[in-house]
Amino acid sequence: MFAWHENIFAIRTVCLAIGSIHLCMLTIGHSTLPIDIFIQALQENGVALLVDVRTIPRSRHNPQFGMEELAASLHAAEIRYRWMQSLGGLRHSRKDSINMGWHNTSFRGYADYMQTDAFATALKELMALDEETTVAIMCSEAVPWRCHRSLIGDALLVNEHTVDDIFVPTAGKSHRKPHTLTTFARVQGTRLWYPEQPTLPLPSRNVP
């Protein structure tokens, strides 16, 4: 039956690798970072493959993160690059959305896309990559909670992947935190959605 996420998961806080099977997916946002700082963060976390989940893999204000420029910089650092448009954002919400817990229409649209066969296929492809090497998924936002990669992280969690979010200061060593499931998410098996939350009534006021 349905259950709140905190009753389902004991979120693993450490990423482990057993043999050639990697149990952890990483996430990162490029923001306005210099390319050398960004690549340093990937190297600090042992990333061998960067999966770009931007819908449009270029940046007018940060040209170092255009697809061709980024792929060349990663190649020089012996890190592979792959663009997965099938996991990109900018999805439209449905009129009959079951994800009304998201007031942000962009996040709701992506959550609606997560209900489709296309997303399920793309997620399986991503998880297969994670079994081969250390993978980080990348989008543009500096922090995951402002980015659709946080929803991808949720989907990975319900599919028994540990997910760590990498945070990168403009100077200094990167650090990472375990990704935790969105608080209002609901889960049934590997199905994930974000229903509208009940509105609590305001406390009554005694009028003299």
How does the language model describe each region?
Residues C15-P208:
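Residues lining hydrophobic/aromatic ligand-binding pockets adjacent to catalytic sites
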